[in-house]
Amino acid sequence: MLRMLIAGVLVVFACVNSAEAAGDDKSARGIVERLQNGIFEVLKHAKELGVDGRYELILPVLERDAHIPLMTATVSGPYWREGSKTQKERAIKAFAEMHSALLAALFDSYNGETYKTVKVRETGGKIVLVDSNIIDSDGEPTLVTFATAKIKGRWWVIDVIIAGGISEVKVKRNEFNRLLEEGGLDNLSAALERKKDRLLFGEEKAVR
């Protein structure tokens, strides 16, 4: 039953992504809207899919639209340069899967939330910021700013800032520092893998 539902949602994805309004990777605004569109399509089917179904659909959306390798390298700091190719590949996979599990656990219901792109801001450098309001069912907006960059001919999301706070990448870098100090990339990857499993099994509550 779950496989059939996932297949059905994937059909919806295909229809949505064929529409011009769904966004694309040719602009900063386009990549942000494509990422949000993908997440919101999963959110609309949250209850029926369950956490495992949401995870299976969110993971490819993140891998498609967020530059996971760059984000993993950034949060790992100097330990990234010290890692082998195998260690880096494991860390990238663990980072993507843990964040997908976190979103799958967080987005467990849909109450009519919507999103709206508010502004696209140049920074004078390679990064372009895209401000978006996530609007709840009461009409209350929460500002989410996506940092984007053009890498190898296309746009990627490389960081997220919620309600004008600190960037998620900086938060994660501080959070992961102890793990990296104690055992480098292997220790970080193992911790992320355990966290993913706890989130999917309901042994750990997702925190925004």
Feature roles, as predicted:
Residues 143-171:
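Short beta-strand edge/turn micro-motifs at domain boundaries
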Residues 161-208:
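Low-complexity, intrinsically disordered terminal/linker segments enriched in charged
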Residues 100-142, 192-208:
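Surface-exposed, charged secondary-structure patches
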Residues 5-15:
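Bacterial N-terminal signal peptides
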Residues 33, 40, 129-133, 143-147, ...:
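Soluble periplasmic/extracytoplasmic beta-strand elements of cell-envelope proteins
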Residues 15-23:
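Sec/Tat signal peptide C-region and signal peptidase I cleavage site
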Residues 23-30, 41, 45-52, 82-86, ...:
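Surface-exposed, polar/charged faces of alpha-helical domains
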Residues 24-103:
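Early exported N-terminus immediately downstream of N-terminal targeting peptides
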